[in-house]
Amino acid sequence: MAERAPRGEVAVMVAVQSALVDRPGMLATARGLSHFGEHCIGWLILALLGAIALPRRRREWLVAGAGAFVAHAIAVLIKRLVRRQRPDHPAIAVNVDTPSQLSFPSAHATSTTAAALLMGRATGLPLPVVLVPPMALSRILLGVHYPSDVAVGVALGATVGAIVDSVGGGRQRARKR
């Protein structure tokens, strides 16, 4: 049987992998981001450290950790409902192990976006611009998510982050004014 040619999202993934996988440090960085974001544990640790190190901003850091966790949990729930399988094409190299075969949406992209939005609020820094693109790209480079999994994960994370901010963090800022 002839090997099927990459089309659609698979072709995008193949193009990303072809362009980036051999660049020095790219694969190692993508794997590091993957491990950091697994079950949103890196974001939870960072939020806890922020809450300890910056007591005046403790609430904002705890809200950021809670938001990342909630975003991750929602993404996992959606994965279990949708049950889309991870990319499976001979032209795609899978460059990291995953805890499940479910793909949609990317929980890494979801929790990273929520964490970046909420930690950006805590620090006053534009963290979504700095943190979200590398994590999103890493999911495609590693061959574990279709681009649509990542895009929906980013949108979901932004939505959850905004809701958590309005419920948990927004009231605190309003009182400080």
Curated annotation (Swiss-Prot):
It catalyses: trans,octa-cis-decaprenylphospho-beta-D-ribofuranose 5-phosphate + H2O = trans,octa-cis-decaprenylphospho-beta-D-ribofuranose + phosphate. Its EC number is 3.1.3.111. It is an enzyme of class 3 (hydrolase). It comes from the Bacteria. One of its GO terms (cellular component) is plasma membrane. Belongs to the PA-phosphatase related phosphoesterase family. It is found in: Cell membrane. Keywords: Cell membrane, Cell wall biogenesis/degradation, Hydrolase, Membrane, Transmembrane, Transmembrane helix. It holds the Pfam family PAP2. It is a multi-pass membrane protein. Phosphatase involved in the biosynthesis of decaprenylphosphoryl arabinose (DPA), which serves as the arabinose donor for the biosynthesis of arabinogalactan, the major mycobacterial cell wall polysaccharide. Catalyzes the dephosphorylation of decaprenylphosphoryl-5-phosphoribose (DPPR) to decaprenyl-phosphoribose (DPR). The keyword Hydrolase applies. The keyword Nucleotide-binding does not apply. GO terms for molecular function: hydrolase activity. This is Decaprenylphosphoryl-5-phosphoribose phosphatase. Pathway: Cell wall biogenesis; cell wall polysaccharide biosynthesis. The chain crosses the membrane at residues 35-55, 62-82, 124-144, 150-170. GO terms for biological process: capsule polysaccharide biosynthetic process; cell wall organization.
